[in-house]
Amino acid sequence: MPGNNLSRAEAADRSAHLRIHNYEVTLDVTTGDNTFYSKSKVTFACSKPGYSTFIDAVGKRLISATLNGKSIDSSEFTGQSLFLKDLQAENELVVEVEAIYSKTGEGLQRSVDPVDNEVYLYSQGETAFIRNMYPCFDQPDLKATFDFTVIAPSHWEVISNNPVKNKSVVDGKNKWEFTRTPVMSTYITAVVAGPYAHVHDEYNGKKKIPMGIYCRKSLFQHLDAEEIFNVTKQGFEYFERVFGLAYAFEKYDQIAVVDFNWGAMENAGCVTFREELLVFRSKVTERMYNARANTILHEMAHMWFGNLVTMKWWDDLWLNESFAEWSSYLALVEATRFKNSWAGFNAERKNWAYRQDQLSSTHPIAADMVDIETVKANFDGITYAKGASVLHQLVAHVGRENFISGLQVYFA
């Protein structure tokens, strides 16, 4: 069995034999400062009865596991994976682990606000970190539906990919149950929890989309929600029209999170942002407003390209990211006040790609992603900006109208 470094060959083998139906994920984040309770009930099919494989599961210890009603011995748990023997045509797997909060932004991150000592949680799944939050087959092509339940302190908010179905009080804590998600990859599932301050609006386009913006209570006074909502609405109107397809998910929340390694993350309906990119604590330049709008639109573009349609394996990471990069600049110019954004792309983003291309670590745009560690090394200017530049050239070559028509056929 692998550790955390899943190989392409291992992923392909699982994909050839498994089809995942649904996950019922239960998290209890009231059990301590270092660990939390995590349970996955997974239903899935296997095309080759008798086949053996593994599920990704990272934790301090295995509490219990059953496969089709039979207990799995704890010796089958490595701390990163759980071995599964003799699968049937249809299977039900239940795994409970004592999972570990992340301090590095991978999995379920736990941070403490120094202003008021309040605790804030958020998940980060890309590339293969969601296994740190709940047991799953953590690869992009093994999609499924998800039912999330979270037990949290009574004064907290809890946000996930889908709207809340039911909220109840259990032993002085709140139990949040969310509606079932559409079919999606594990890496874009999300849970965010804590005493977040929030504000809400709605976009009315091809359908009504409830929208929320969340941040730490101590930052809320700095949140310019009107500007963020305005860019978000402009993005929805533009992408729904250009892509020819309504937004596929049920809501759209944007959350500023602390100690974040990335600029933002396109979790379906639950987008997380580095705080300083979304919330400005002081007066900033127009360039910063442009950068924020670009990030908002980049993540929104992923709702179609990446979340709705998804790469089979991380070999196509470049297309996932370069398409969102190209789309965000197109939307900036054609749907927002930032009409000169292509000049910024040429001056900044392409130069980023030029610099990276001159290093000994340069690589083809479409890199050979043999395993997860290789993928991690390729979130760079070549994957994003050089790839977007090539797409921009392609659009110029085939013609914008032809390219957009092809996209609409693809999404349909």
Model-derived features: where do they sit?
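Hydrophobic alpha-helical and helix-loop surface patches within well-folded domains
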Residues: 178, 213-412
